[in-house]
From Swiss-Prot:
CDD domains: DEADc (cd00268), SF2_C_DEAD (cd18787)
Span of domain Helicase ATP-binding: 104-279
Domain of life: Eukaryota
UniProt catalytic activity: ATP + H2O = ADP + phosphate + H(+)
Motif position, DEAD box: 226-229
PANTHER family reported in the protein's UniProt record: ATP-DEPENDENT RNA HELICASE DBP3
Function: ATP-dependent RNA helicase required for 60S ribosomal subunit synthesis. Involved in efficient pre-rRNA processing, predominantly at site A3, which is necessary for the normal formation of 25S and 5.8S rRNAs.
Region (Disordered): 1-42
Name of the gene this protein is made from: dbp3
Location of the protein in the cell: Nucleus, Nucleolus
The name this protein goes by in its record: ATP-dependent RNA helicase dbp3
InterPro entries hit by this protein: DEAD/DEAH_box_helicase_dom, Helicase_ATP-bd, Helicase_C-like, P-loop_NTPase, RNA-helicase_DEAD-box_CS
Organism of provenance: Emericella nidulans (strain FGSC A4 / ATCC 38163 / CBS 112.46 / NRRL 194 / M139)
Length: 488
């Protein structure tokens, strides 16, 4: 019975041998071969599939079908056939993550996909492996400065991280990947683009190279918008539209990954995607922000002048013996610089990352922290989204961020890839406007709410806008003004 249900769900994932589509695929190198679901996956009992979806809180919404069309790939052994070397780096992993399991079959089948999941859930491989397989399957000769796949990321650090992960797989099958971002000279990037089939880039630099003729996006068959909500928050909406405009529509597969699902992100998806399947891991993404339940959250209410002394005490406790990696967040660049200097005078191995540092200095700080040369990284929110720094045992919020969403993103640097995490937040009276929202996050994750925090009140104050009031997030942003110059 389970097998029959599966056949109903898979639709055209198993075309007949007489299918003309198969013959056309051989002739047309611009089209990927169809996705064939593993026979071994066919034989998995439906009850086991249902349990997997339930245990991982996976919701799949497909407007073009009544039910999810394909079964999740719950084991690496169920991956579709490809160059065996492409999958070789997976030997270091036990099993796919929830977002990988749910999105892989859809992406391998060529569907447009919206993935909504917390950071640290394995999203890079979720879109990265199908990307590389598609490039292999197309079997087209690479043309200079005309990539087949583009991944757009909001920050340089995240772009570098995506690049590093993709290269581990791409180099096994001789696929060239280029990483493009601002803050460095363009000449080396132009040279890398000549042989790159896959380009990972930030919107600003990608648009620059596109505008000056260094890059032709007319052959792109696979487009990824990673951390889409973050890119829109940073004001890149028009840049993204300009970048996508010359890309082919009919033969392009578009993938969007996001941690939240506000109206502005939904509008972007409706503009550039074709009948997308939405895969949600966890609760309602449009609801209040929720923290990773594996993270132990501790909130300490302190006086503003006590914060730095308390930070030193916390670090002394966590840096004994085998020192833990600790990520300390500050709100402002000057504050981060001051805290970094303080910790260095106290004998801690510390590095910093914030907007005043050059690109090379930021690289060095991240590498020092990743390698263990520095065990404390002091950062502003530039590092709060997307960075996958392994084995961060503790996040300390020296100063509470401007929004509770940023709080959730900050503490998401720990407790990644299934590990447990720990976050300590130093909360002061100046942060009391955020107390209600923070209390809700703590309660939703079954964390202790200190009495001192409750005294600030549990009311959640809605964000206000001068023109739109409390409903500004649901209002379509106005079109940017055009500068008009009149003759004398």
């Amino acid at each position: 019975m389970a097998k029959r249900e599966h056949q109903d769900q898979t639709g055209d994932s198993r075309p007949s041998k007489k299918s003309k589509g198969t013959k056309d695929t051989k002739k047309n190198t611009e089209v990927s071969p169809p996705y064939f679901q593993s026979p071994a996956l066919d034989n998995v009992p439906q009850t086991e599939i249902d349990k997997f979806l339930s245990d991982h809180s996976i919701k799949i919404t497909d407007a073009s079908a009544d039910k999810p069309s394909l079964r999740p790939i719950i084991s690496f052994s169920f991956l579709p056939p490809s160059n065996k070397d492409l999958y070789a780096p997976l030997d270091g992993f036990a099993s796919p993550t929830a977002i990988q399991s749910a999105t892989w079959p859809l992406l391998f089948a060529g569907r447009d996909v919206i993935g909504i999941a917390e950071t640290g859930s394995g999203k890079t491989l979720a879109f990265g492996l199908p990307c590389l397989k598609k490039v292999l399957d197309l079997k087209t000769k690479q043309k200079s400065c005309r990539p087949l796949a583009v991944v757009i990321s909001p920050t340089r650090e995240l772009a570098m991280q995506i690049y590093d992960q993709l290269v581990k797989f791409a180099e096994k099958v001789d696929i060239q990947v280029a990483c493009i971002f601002g803050g460095v000279k363009k000449d080396e990037q132009r040279e890398a683009l000549k042989s790159a089939a896959v380009v990972v880039a930030t919107p600003g630099r990608l648009k620059d190279l596109q505008n000056d003729g260094s890059l032709d996006l007319g052959r792109v068959k696979y487009l990824v918008l990673d951390e889409a909500d973050r890119m829109l928050d940073k004001g890149f909406e028009q840049d993204i539209k300009d970048i996508i405009s010359p890309m082919p529509v009919s033969k392009r597969q578009t993938v969007m990954f996001t941690a939240t699902w506000p109206p502005i992100v939904r509008n972007l998806a409706s503009t550039f995607m074709t009948s997308p399947v939405t895969v949600t891991i966890g609760g309602d993404p449009s609801a209040d922000p929720r923290a990773n339940s594996r993270i132990k959250q501790v909130v300490e209410v302190v006086k503003p002048h006590e914060k730095e002394q308390r930070l030193v005490q916390i670090l002394n406790r966590h840096q004994r013996g085998t020192p833990d990696k600790v990520l300390a967040f500050c709100l402002y660049k000057k504050e981060a610089m001051r805290v970094e200097r303080l910790l260095r005078t106290k004998g801690f191995k510390v590095a910093g990352i914030h907007g005043d540092l050059s690109q090379q200095e930021r690289f060095r700080s991240l590498e020092a922290f990743k390698s263990g040369a520095a065990t404390v990284l002091v950062a502003t929110d530039v590092a709060a989204r997307g960075l996958d720094i392994p084995h961060v045992k503790l996040v300390v919020n020296v100063t509470f961020p401007l929004t509770v969403e940023d709080y959730v993103h900050r503490i998401g640097r720990t407790g990644r890839a299934g590990a447990d995490g720990h976050a300590i937040t130093l909360f002061t009276e100046t942060d009391k406007a955020q107390s209600g929202a923070l209390i809700n996050v703590l309660k939703a994750a079954n964390q202790e709410v200190p009495e001192a925090l409750l005294k600030f009140g549990s009311t959640v104050k809605k964000k206000q806008h001068d023109a739109y009031g409390a409903f500004f997030k649901d209002v379509e942003p106005g079109k940017a003004a055009t500068k008009i110059v009149f003759d004398d």
